[in-house]
């Protein structure tokens, strides 16, 4: 394996699949087997050091899944994508996933991650092909985003931060239930006639502000507990554990804390 410094464009991802310059095709094949075995909601860590190709790995997974799903607009030249690589043939059976990529680091300037995560699901790739305000799906998506933004916005509904500080615990509970319902509605709109399972890929979490990283983990665990959602965190788990320990203080077991948020860890070589 060697480091690749170019951007993970589709052309670069395809080229790397063909020449296996990162030595990851074997890992990709194993990952396909894991996805095939998952039943119901699931979360996993793809764990590797910085600069080892995690982003390329998860972007390749997303690229392949988009290509093999016949109901996505990006579906097309599967042979051109996989070439003669029989090792990756198991992906042809994974044709019911809707992959959504979310770069946490690029969004950590926000106070709360959920609105940007919801927007990524609603607007990214083929999931937003019908996102127009004059369509029924567009109206549903817009209404769902409005509900989510209402909880985190100014005025109107209380912010969760203020509510949980003791100002209005009843409103806090109502806001949380609103978010749960809104997230479920968002998945309802994104998946029908396109896929059975949403694969949410969360990348660069270990590079985020500590408070933002913690909110991503907590909100996804609490709000995306859905049998139709699989969450993949692409992380340097060792670095992320230090982030956790720095947040909670000396002597706190960051690794043990992180274990609350995944069902399986996949170490990349």
In which residue ranges do the predicted regions lie?
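Conserved strand-to-helix beginnings and helix N-cap segments that scaffold or border functional pockets
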Residues: 111-115, 210-217
